[in-house]
Amino acid sequence: MTIQTPNRPTPLVLPATCALAWLAVAGHLAWSAEARRPAPVFARENLVAWCIVPFDAAKRGPDERAEMVARLGLRRVAYDWRDEHVPTFEAEILAYKRHGLEYFAFWSWHPDMAGLIDKHGIRPQIWQTNPSPSGEAEAKVRVAGRQLLPLAEQARKLGCKLGLYNHGGWGGEPENLVAVCRWLRAETASDHVGIVYNLHHGHAHVPRFSELLTLMQPYLFCLNLNGMNDDEKPKILPLGQGQHDVALLKIIAESGYTGPIGIIDHRGDTDAEEALRANLDGLKKVLKELGDTAALETYQ
């Protein structure tokens, strides 16, 4: 019996010019994919300076502060304030613009900011403590959501996000942050509401941090770091000096979270530049331990 061999197709041979064109296209696609890839979560460009205004022992003004942040190679500031800073709200915005800084977030709220946000075309996140009302669990969620609704509406009108901030109490528990956020989104169509999570207000959460980060992640607008020891000893600690720092940053790196990362001063007896620099040095130390060369390269 004769087995018939099927006719084999003639190999396609591209002219040299076509082959080069295909190589160019492939190279462009590879470059485009690389360009679209998000920066490593702990990259310098992803960092936000936080708690550097009332806590700064050097008592800098807007221009000095902007110069200091730029000198450290940071590009984003979350602005916290006290009553004495209200007269310089606009000067702060202008100083950041002059130094190429993003006015990333504004603490709580002040009516003077509405006009300034529109006037200067900035769109900061508004960071507000999640309330801790009394009552039963489900009622607390509704009450907290209703308390936040006026600010949520103000943020919506301004084109800003509202970040629910953990600051202790019932409202600072991750499950309750998520519950209030979900209520506002479901009941008031407030999809611009999310969560700002702070490690320095979350020492009790460390044993369950991986689980809690997974719960919060769909709503997370910013994650603020801190050196972490057991029992808040001390509460504020530079990164790299805490017993849990490597483990916590490893969890964050492996979680898939790619949003902003905050580093803090929050020490009224310390120059804010010294505090931020200590956190940057500590962050690099932890990144070396984690082998995160991609993030480390951004600090060269």
Locate the predicted segments by residue.
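Active-site mouth loops of central-metabolism enzymes
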Residues: V48-G61, P133-V141, L237-P238
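Conserved beta-strand positions in the central sheet of alpha/beta enzyme cores
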Residues: C51, A78, F104-W107, Q125-I126, ...
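Short, acidic/polar
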Residues: F55-A70, T88-E92, H110-L116, A144, ...
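Active-site acidic/histidine proton-transfer and metal-coordination neighborhood
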Residues: L101-I195, L199-A204, E297
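Histidine-acidic metal/acid-base catalytic patches
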Residues: S32-V48, D63-R65, L149-E153, K157-G159, ...
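Catalytic domains of carbohydrate-active enzymes, especially glycoside hydrolases
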Residues: P62-H85, E102-F104
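Bacterial N-terminal signal peptides
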Residues: P15-H28
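N-terminal secretory signal peptides that target proteins for export/translocation
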Residues: M1-T10
